[in-house]
Regions:
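Serine endopeptidase catalytic core focused on the charge-relay Asp
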Residues: 2-16, 20-24, 31-39, 43-134, ...
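Catalytic nucleophile loop of clan PA
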Residues: 20, 143-166
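Conserved PDZ fold ligand-binding element
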Residues: 27-28, 162
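Short solvent-exposed strand/turn elements
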Residues: 84-89, 139-146
Length: 199
């Protein structure tokens, strides 16, 4: 099983969500964690943003978005951030473009919702999905009233990241972007993927 390094995403010194390491110096998160309507210049221009990634409370690492303009143009709630330093000495490949249907499979989500005091792990079941999203039914004992801060968290099956959380439907259900969709929509040249495996 692969170890997945998750951390908090900070924008303008405020925690906006969760992100996780997908390469030695690249983090992925939900685009809305780093871009709000106020960030878009009057003429519609979008500039790459400085973002901080925080694994331990007192040691944030600075980075800059790699594909914010492209993500906004293509309408996908996902962005990659290149960090100024490597956080791993060994190659990392956690994003998994799987070929099978996950409906009915159990999954895990780990991240930093504001309602919790630190990192938590939720378990659930993939309820249904389409090419561009899937729905997770959170186990009753793991349900929260508000999942704010969980956006950008990895969704894993057997340690493989198959998606990232982008929003909450209600206290019982979360919506996620499939890795396969992210790879099809965004240029991800510097990001390693495991392609078309059966989990």
């Amino acid at each position: 099983m692969r170890e997945i390094t998750t951390g908090k995403i900070l924008k303008d010194q405020k925690v906006t969500g969760t992100g996780f390491l997908v390469a030695e110096n690249i983090v992925v998160t939900a685009k809305h964690n780093v871009l709000t309507a106020e960030d878009i210049v009057d003429d519609g221009t979008i500039h790459e943003r400085e973002i901080w990634f925080l694994i331990t409370e007192d040691d944030p690492v600075r980075g800059k978005t790699m594909n914010l303009r492209e993500a906004e143009k293509r309408g996908i709630d996902c962005v990659f951030i290149r960090l100024e330093e490597k956080l791993s000495e060994k190659p990392i490949t956690v994003l998994t473009e799987a070929e099978n249907d996950f409906t009915g499979d159990f999954c895990k989500i780990s991240g930093y919702p504001k309602e919790a005091s630190g990192k938590i792990e939720l378990q659930g079941c993939i309820a249904n999905g389409t090419e561009d999203k899937f729905i997770i039914s959170v186990n009753k004992e793991d349900e929260l009233q508000d999942y704010q801060g969980l956006s950008g968290s990895p969704v894993t099956i057997f340690g493989c990241v198959i998606g990232i959380v982008i929003r909450q439907e209600n206290s019982e259900r979360l919506e996620a972007l499939p890795v396969k969709y992210i790879r099809n929509v965004l240029k991800c040249h510097d990001v390693p993927f495991l392609s078309l495996i059966h989990i």
